[in-house]
Amino acid sequence: MKNTMKKPVSIPVEKLRPFEGHPFKVKDDEEMNNLIESVQTQGILSPLIVRPIESTEEYEVISGHRRLHAAVKAGIREVPALVVSLDRDAAAIVLVDSNLHREHILPSEKAFAYKMKAEALAHQGFRADLTSDQLGPKLTVEMISESDSASQVKRYIRLTNLIPEILQYVDEGRISFTPAVELSYLNEQEQYDLLEQMELNDCTPSLSQACRFKKISQEEGLTPEVIATVMSEEKANQREMFKVPMERIRQYVPNANAKQAEDFVLKACEHYRKFLIRQRNRDER
């Protein structure tokens, strides 16, 4: 990565633009509030990485979108940034690599990040055939991800074929990763027909149902009637349900997805059960 300037410079926030199409969400949540507080008290400790936008006096942010957002929220007018000379593909690779180490990454973020990096590598001349089982040189796969296998990378990229509404279900933990991969083989209209049934019946397809949908879609096409019939089948894990709106749990676990919130509630119930047992034992003495 060739630096246009060796040391960070101060750049007005109004001259900074987000990287076009970057896959990582910048959310106003508890983590952002903590970052804003840190920026207010300590400033931005790690400079942003930016690149000049041709024929303008503006810059495109490669790394540091969350820090920039926190700075704007904190009322800071200028931020330190390292200006580098990179083409879009090289910048995309740096952007992805600088974000994949984060503790909390949504499935959709990882999916589009892997896709962005694979496309950038392909533009640079590396083989990144993610549609077949033969990925080409092992080095290419390792360059896409150091933590996920080639097959897992392909499965994540499959998620980019999901319509936004179903992908949101995946991010919220309401549809598991493996069924979501199977659903990604449905065409757009089939996915919207499925979404309608999911919302109508307040349920999501199991892995078995998702596999059946994929098979029917590839063999003869999936109709709304078939989707309704399959979704009306009772799943073992849906025979008896107790639901609590996420809004009522957010104050206790603000950053949790649906699965993490469920685990929190179950652990809380177990602690309370033990408390009641201890209380009863004391009363019986």
PLM regions and their residue ranges:
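Charged, alpha-helix-enriched surfaces in structured cytosolic catalytic cores
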Residues: 27-30, 34, 65-66, 91, ...
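Glutamine-centric residue-chemistry signal
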Residues: 40-46, 124, 134, 191, ...
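Alpha-helical interaction elements
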Residues: 102-186
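Amphipathic alpha-helical extensions and coiled-coil-like segments
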Residues: 150-268
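Short acidic DE-rich linear segments
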Residues: 275-285
